[in-house]
Structure formats: structure tokens, C-alpha cells
A protein has these predicted regions:
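Class I SAM-binding transferase module
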Residues: 1-54, 58-355
């Protein structure tokens, strides 16, 4: 992604004083609904508990927690938006429950060395980690969360899949009866220097999605997030044009358990098949010479590395490399149509029958 932003930690928080950003997030219905259902659908987890909201923004998640019966909610917001959050809290008559602090969570202190039962945060960035604030949430977890405390969300998964990108390729072949291939080519060259945030239709995915990484937010460390790598041979599940790779994420929330019932798990998904969110999907476009027509069961070999930017640690650099499916090791059994995999699958099937 673009790394031209100065390595100024204050600039990150200042950007969140733009109310248009918060209008976008508050208008994101899947995002709002997931947090509301996860919190208000688990009132038994919040009733009488102490909650820490990291990066509280307008305070809406803190209000959900108060509505769910939390005894005390500490809403920490590093930007001047904290003043508006206080007004929103007052407007909803929760001043006795929600306390808003204008500071970074790294500078925050809970009174009397109190510990939080639950940490709530909407920290996710593009492809989960880019321009997000997970490091601050993990700091809060280690500093303030009780040993048996809960994280909302509590897990996160990054997926990757080969895809077609007709909006960047096919549409320029005939635009209102005019060939604009040269424009499309120039546009792709301009865009290929960094990943793009796009809406990808589910029918343009050539694979259902491979898990690049899964994070347990009670256990993962900031150091483990410095670099994440996937090296895979995926098998195309439908025919189509390989023009890029699509990245998205899911987050899950804890579900309460009791003798009477177990509340259903809430998932916030940015999968192309799910309702669109403001995160959309992240797409790495391939150079034109690397694009190819795929048949179902064709193998696609690649490696992708997400590396924390050295100058701005909230940003991540992506490095995609196409590999030779002939020489790369395939998962077993492999469903691709390469001869070696067909023979190996037949051999494994024979062994199972004999067994």
C-alpha cells in the first residue's frame, strides 16, 4: 500500500478527527450489526463488568456495552473526537457508566490498578492489518485485561484467493463501442505499484479462499505480526482469467455459554460473498504478461509476504511472487489436473480401498 505518509504517529490519530471517516464507519451496516449483535446478544457476559473500549471514536461501541449492562466502560480515544464522544454519551444518558479519556491507550491508566473484564475495539484496517491499530489493542490486553478476560473480537483470519478483475482489464476492451485498451494498460501500470481497495464480486473469485493466517487475539504478540507469509499451490475451482489476487478478512466474537443455551457466534466478514463493508477487499493486480486463462483444476502457485513498514509501523508492505506450479510442492491429496497429482491421488485412493 501507499507508504508516502510521514512517520508521524500523531498524523494517524489526527486523521480520525475527520467526521466523514466516522460517517463512513457508522454507515457500514455489517460492521455496526456485527458489534451490536455480539455485545447485546451476550448481555450475560457484560452485565456488571468493567469494559475497556480502545479507540472509542464516537463512542458507539461503549454505548452498546452500557446498554448490555456493563458496570463501567472506559472509552479511550486519542483524537479530539473524544469531546464528541462525551456529548454522545451524555445524549444517551450514560455519563454515570461511560468515562471518556482523551489519550493514547499507551498513556492511559485504570484507576486503583483496576483490571478490565472485557476489551472491545474496532481496530481492523485494510486486509486486517494495514493502517489498523492492533498493536495498541494488544498493549491494552497485556496491560489491563484480567487473565480470564474476553476480547471483542477474539479471533481474526486473513484469506487470499486468485481472482479476475474485469473492472481493471476487460471493460477497456470495448467502452461505448470504443477500444480503450491502451488507457486500461496505462491505468493498470499506475495502479500496480500498490494494492487497490476494490469491491470484488464473488463470481470473480477463482478459489473460495485460502487461510493465510489465523490470529487468536488473546495470545498473538506484536512481534508475530512483523511479517506474515503464505506459500501455496491453490487449485482453481472455476474457469476464468487470472488477473490478480484478492485478500479479505473475517473476525469472530465470543459467544456466551450456559446450561440453558449457547448464544450463536457472530462473524464480521469482508468476504466478497458477504454484504459489502467499508473495508471492501484488497486486490493485488498482476502485470499483463502474467495474466492467463485458467481452467477449473488448474494449479496457481504463489508466495505472499506481509511485512510491517519500517518507517510507519501501522502500515504493511505486500510482496507477491508467482511461482512455477510444476516445481512447487503440492498439498496431498491435490485435486489439480497435473499428471503427477492425478497419479498420486489415484495411488492414495487405491491405498484407502485396500486398507
Amino acid at each position: 500500500m501507499d507508504n508516502t505518509e510521514e512517520a508521524d504517529p500523531g498524523a494517524y490519530f489526527d486523521s480520525y478527527e475527520d467526521l466523514k471517516i466516522h460517517e463512513l464507519m457508522l454507515s457500514d451496516e455489517p460492521r455496526q450489526t456485527a458489534y451490536q449483535n455480539a455485545i447485546l446478544g451476550n448481555r450475560q457476559l457484560f452485565a456488571g463488568k468493567t469494559v475497556l473500549d480502545v479507540g472509542a471514536g464516537t463512542g458507539i461501541l461503549s454505548l452498546f456495552c452500557a446498554q448490555a449492562g456493563a458496570r463501567k466502560v472506559y472509552a479511550v480515544e486519542a483524537s479530539n473526537l473524544a469531546h464528541l464522544a462525551r456529548a454522545v454519551v451524555k445524549e444517551n444518558n450514560f455519563e454515570q457508566v461511560i468515562e471518556v479519556s482523551e489519550c493514547k491507550v499507551e498513556e492511559f491508566r485504570l484507576p486503583n490498578d483496576e483490571r478490565a473484564d472485557i476489551i472491545v475495539s474496532e481496530w481492523m484496517g485494510f486486509f486486517l492489518l494495514h493502517e489498523g491499530m492492533l498493536d495498541s489493542v494488544l498493549y491494552a490486553r497485556d496491560k489491563f485485561l484480567k487473565p480470564n478476560g474476553l476480547m471483542f473480537p477474539n479471533t481474526a483470519t486473513i484469506y487470499i484467493a486468485p481472482c479476475s478483475v474485469p473492472s481493471r482489464f476487460d471493460r477497456w476492451e470495448n467502452l461505448s463501442g470504443v477500444s480503450m485498451k491502451c488507457f486500461g494498460r496505462a491505468l493498470r501500470e499506475q495502479c500496480s505499484s500498490k494494492p487497490e481497495v476494490l469491491t470484488v464480486a464473488s463470481e470473480h473469485l477463482l478459489h473460495e479462499g485460502h487461510v493465510m493466517t489465523w490470529l487468536d487475539l488473546k495470545e498473538v504478540t506484536s512481534e508475530e505480526l512483523n511479517s506474515i507469509e503464505a506459500k501455496e499451490v491453490l487449485v482453481a475451482q472455476r474457469e476464468g482469467k487470472l488477473q490478480g489476487f484478492c485478500i479479505w478478512f473475517d473476525c469472530t466474537f465470543p459467544a456466551a455459554e450456559s446450561d440453558e443455551q449457547m448464544s450463536s457466534e457472530v462473524i464480521l466478514s469482508t468476504n466478497p460473498s458477504a454484504p459489502e463493508t467499508h473495508w471492501k477487499q484488497t486486490v493485488i493486480l498482476l502485470p499483463e504478461q502474467a495474466c492467463e486463462e485458467l481452467e477449473a483444476r488448474d494449479p496457481v502457485a504463489f508466495s505472499l509476504t506481509m511485512t510491517r513498514n519500517q518507517e510507519t509501523n501501522r502500515r504493511y508492505d505486500l510482496q507477491l511472487t508467482l511461482l512455477d506450479a510444476e516445481t512447487e510442492e503440492h498439498n496431498l491429496p491435490c485435486e489439480c489436473q497435473m499428471t503427477k497429482c492425478i497419479l498420486m491421488k489415484a495411488h492414495l485412493d487405491t491405498m484407502q480401498v485396500d486398507g
